[in-house]
């Protein structure tokens, strides 16, 4: 899991190290599986962002968004498997991006702009709150770009 850089409450004092991440409290691997970025067979964590109160972790073509509930901050598992809550974790692949490995997500004009070496896209958020039912990524362009610096 990602490391945390946190203010300690004292002026100019910060801590850096492993954080406490909530585990799976409901379900099993069939109905509440582990996030894609923990899979050793994938490319690991390729980028981080935040959007609409969710921490976003990119892992190759996978986009994983934490829960946005107050109690579920940084929770990457569903809290119940009997119903799908709007605040639950969101995870999907952008199938129209043909193997893109996302590195950056930049909030812009109420949307989230996605960037990889050969694909650019957008997660629309202007007219809606993202939920597991409506989250999608749309391909906007396929230009080659240098990702040495954030767009």
Which residues make up each language-model segment?
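Beta-propeller and closely related beta-pinwheel folds
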Residues: 20-151
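N-terminal accessory interaction module
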Residues: 1-31
């Amino acid at each position: 899991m990602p490391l945390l850089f946190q203010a300690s409450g004292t002026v100019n004092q910060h801590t850096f190290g492993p954080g406490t991440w909530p585990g799976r409290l409901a379900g099993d691997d069939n109905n509440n599986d582990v996030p894609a970025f923990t899979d050793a067979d994938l490319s690991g964590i390729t980028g981080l962002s935040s959007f609409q109160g969710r921490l976003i972790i990119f892992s190759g073509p996978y986009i994983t968004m934490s829960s946005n509930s107050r109690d579920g901050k940084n929770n990457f598992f569903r809290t119940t498997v009997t119903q799908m809550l709007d605040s639950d974790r969101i995870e999907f692949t952008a199938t129209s991006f043909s193997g893109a490995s996302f590195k950056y997500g930049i909030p812009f004009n109420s949307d989230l702009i996605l960037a990889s070496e050969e694909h650019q896209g957008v997660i629309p958020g202007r007219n809606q709150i993202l939920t597991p039912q409506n989250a999608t990524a749309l391909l906007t362009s396929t230009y080659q770009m240098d990702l040495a610096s954030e767009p």
